[in-house]
């Protein structure tokens, strides 16, 4: 599903806002997809470490660009919505997730953050409970007056699935608690399956011709979430208790005491848990558990550290979806050796050419791996990876496993270095490598089949042509039926299908009225402003802001296309000139001279116009439009107190939304940026302003409140 190779190799700190926003949107979709598979269908497509890497990258993007954070971002939510097949249970105390630590430095950071929060001068002596992180399905058990009243999965953290009937069939979970138990007790823990029972279950499933499970976690989750409790009753499920939710009385003063109390009430708790009193002891525990991991009867994917004293847990509290007083220290990825059969080239939805290793199937960490990413041409050359090599494969932080090294002593004598293609294997267009970049990219953006659906989705999106009723599902359907293959095809659809409308209705499943409404929506977009037209073409690095700069500079579509074609011709004639645009040509130098564009963006625009397929598609599109409206300079910018100034908005504004604030500023001739730099003139801060305000203070920039900003733009020349 993923095509994040375009920018994932780029450090977050060097991304533009447009790049970050595009990657952020893709990551949100990707993570939502995998959460639905993991929590809703118990059928994950990727390793836990790969999923962790996606969330880690998303968190990094949002830390660098706080304006990208939305309430439904995976960083602000937990798990996935409950399935429609079960009743819903609202958790009285939310079932939150845990932050992850991957290195000793991460653990140091976790402990030091706690010390700073609690204002402790010494971190040694602060007690933690360390316990294995069971790889299973989270479960909450509610007991009322000693009797099991309800059992629910975690779901999205706020609402889970009612699996009470199924849980009553699990022998390790008591139906009644002994005397002295709290009148209300929610026990939280993990449903799991020991490996020996998992293998036996898979043998029985295979003999019966039924589905076999990829790993014990999937087997446990799938067994618990059966609609028929009698199926669950036949599955060897186990349960570890490690926490609690709603309580009528405390279980103890510390995490350790509470675990012992749960054990006394009849629940199994991890025998491998340990009380630790320093960072060194935490890391020793991690190393010991890791070394003995294979000998454990159940799967674990790391260890969990929790502050022992419950009063300190309460003081530390929670972030949006994770407690400050706990973290999960994950184990590194697992490795195996296998044969590299072939190297194939995949073309992603934005044109990135990604090499993929086709492998002799091998089991890595319980999952059969037959393909692995090779990232890019540089990685292949650096590691000298060749077809026929024996390679080491790792399940790590990528969407598919990766090849980490070559076993050169087993290399065939007749092997040859891999030659990376210079043309797209999908459409034959030139594949161009960006200056100072690692990714080769197909330049046939408007015609390449591998990019077509994503390009068309972008073309009709809200800030481009904004064609109502032509969403991703319809685009995919029309593309699969060979009805829409290029932007121009959208505007010829009615002409081509009008005489066979009934057939179109029958083949698409749309109602006649729906199709007629779509035709009207398409016709309504035959006129479009120049900046939206430029943005709609999906040229790499040309986001909304850059499209507006181009529209302001060239004013009309004719001059713009002519000058871009001229710049592309100049660049093609001078491909090696890397530092002086004026030596390339007049049109190219003019393009590079536009503020905030430069050679990198100019080269991507030139690559687009240098490809004949794109020019043909562009000509065909222009023939179908009534007009691409000339750019009209913003009114009353002359004399405006903010004309020519660079403005950054941060935090929540009270009197207007971010889009309105941006539009008003631009109408006054200001440039609205997404990040703070030394070139920023004004930083307007609303409620809950974050890192941008802090950076503005560090740089000594002018910081305005919302009211001060409104007062400023209300001066003569304002709107």
From Swiss-Prot:
Belongs to the NAD-dependent DNA ligase family. LigA subfamily. NAD(+) binds at residues 48-52, 97-98, 131, 154, 190, 306, 330. It comes from Rhodospirillum centenum (strain ATCC 51521 / SW). Its EC number is 6.5.1.2. Zn(2+) binds at residues 424, 427, 442, 448. This is DNA ligase. Pfam families: BRCT, DNA_ligase_aden, DNA_ligase_OB, DNA_ligase_ZBD, HHH_2. Its cofactor is Mg(2+); Mn(2+). GO terms for molecular function: DNA ligase (NAD+) activity; metal ion binding.
């Amino acid at each position: 599903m993923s095509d994040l190779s375009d920018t994932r190799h780029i450090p977050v700190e060097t991304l533009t806002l447009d790049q970050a926003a595009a990657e952020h949107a893709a990551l949100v979709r990707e993570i939502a997809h995998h959460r639905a598979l993991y929590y809703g269908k118990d059928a994950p497509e990727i390793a836990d470490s790969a999923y962790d890497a996606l969330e880690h990258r998303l968190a990094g993007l949002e830390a660098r660009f706080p304006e990208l954070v939305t309430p439904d971002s995976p960083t602000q939510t937990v798990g996935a919505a409950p399935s429609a097949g079960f009743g819903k249970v609202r958790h009285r105390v939310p079932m939150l997730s845990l932050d992850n630590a991957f290195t000793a430095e991460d653990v140091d950071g976790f402990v030091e953050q706690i010390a700073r929060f609690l204002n402790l001068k010494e971190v040694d002596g602060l007690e933690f409970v360390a316990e294995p992180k069971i790889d299973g399905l989270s479960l909450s058990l509610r007991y009322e007056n000693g009797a099991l009243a309800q059992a629910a999965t975690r779901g999205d953290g706020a609402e889970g699935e009612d699996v009470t009937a199924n849980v009553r069939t699990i022998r390790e979970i008591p139906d009644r608690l002994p005397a002295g138990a709290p009148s209300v007790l929610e026990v939280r823990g993990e449903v799991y399956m020991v490996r020996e029972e998992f293998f036996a279950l898979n043998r029985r499933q295979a003999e019966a011709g039924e589905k076999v499970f990829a790993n014990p976690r999937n087997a446990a989750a799938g067994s618990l979430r059966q609609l028929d409790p009698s199926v669950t009753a036949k599955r060897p499920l186990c349960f570890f208790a490690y926490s609690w939710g709603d309580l009528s009385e405390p279980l103890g003063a510390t995490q350790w005491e509470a675990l012992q109390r749960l054990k006394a009430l009849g629940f199994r708790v991890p025998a491998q848990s340990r009380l630790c009193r320093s960072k060194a002891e935490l890391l020793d525990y991690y190393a010991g558990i890791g070394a003995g991991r294979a000998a454990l009867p159940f799967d674990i994917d790391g260890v969990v550290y929790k502050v022992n004293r419950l009063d300190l847990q309460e003081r530390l509290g929670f972030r949006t979806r994770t407690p400050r007083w706990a973290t999960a220290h994950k184990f590194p990825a697992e490795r195996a050796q296998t044969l590299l059969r072939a190297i194939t080239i995949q073309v992603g939805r934005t044109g990135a050419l990604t090499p993929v290793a086709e492998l002799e199937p091998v089991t890595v960490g319980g999952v059969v791996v037959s393909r692995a990413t090779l990232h890019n041409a540089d990685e292949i050359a650096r590691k000298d990876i060749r077809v026929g090599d024996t390679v080491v494969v790792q399940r790590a932080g990528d969407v598919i496993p990766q090849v980490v090294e070559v076993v050169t002593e087993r290399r065939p004598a007749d092997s040859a270095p891999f030659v990376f293609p210079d043309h797209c294997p999908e459409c034959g267009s030139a594949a161009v490598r960006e200056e100072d970049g690692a990714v080769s990219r197909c330049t046939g953006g408007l015609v390449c089949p591998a990019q077509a659906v994503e390009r068309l989705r972008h073309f009709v999106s809200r800030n481009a042509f904004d064609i109502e009723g032509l969403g991703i599902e319809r685009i995919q359907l029309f593309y699969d039926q060979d009805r829409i293959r290029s932007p121009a095809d959208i505007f010829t659809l009615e002409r081509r299908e009008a005489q066979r409308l009934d057939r179109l209705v029958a083949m698409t499943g749309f109602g006649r009225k729906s199709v007629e409404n779509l035709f009207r929506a398409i016709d309504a977009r035959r006129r479009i402003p120049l900046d939206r037209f430029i943005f709609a073409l999906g040229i790499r690095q040309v986001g909304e802001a850059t499209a507006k700069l181009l529209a302001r500079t060239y004013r009309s579509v004719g001059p713009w296309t002519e000058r871009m074609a001229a710049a592309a011709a100049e660049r093609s004639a001078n491909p090696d000139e890397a530092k002086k645009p004026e030596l390339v040509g007049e049109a190219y130098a003019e393009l590079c001279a536009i503020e905030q564009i430069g050679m990198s963006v100019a080269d991507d625009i030139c690559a687009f116009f240098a490809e004949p397929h794109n020019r043909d598609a562009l000509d065909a599109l222009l023939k179908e439009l009534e007009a691409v409206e000339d750019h009209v300079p913003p009114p009353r910018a002359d004399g405006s107190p903010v004309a020519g100034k660079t403005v950054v908005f941060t935090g929540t504004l009270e009197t207007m939304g971010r889009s309105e604030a941006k539009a008003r500023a631009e109408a006054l001739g200001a440039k609205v940026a997404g990040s703070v730099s030394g070139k920023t003139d004004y930083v307007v801060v609303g409620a809950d302003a974050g890192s941008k305000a802090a950076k503005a203070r560090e740089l000594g920039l002018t910081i305005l409140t919302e009211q001060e900003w409104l007062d400023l733009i209300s001066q003569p020349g304002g709107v």
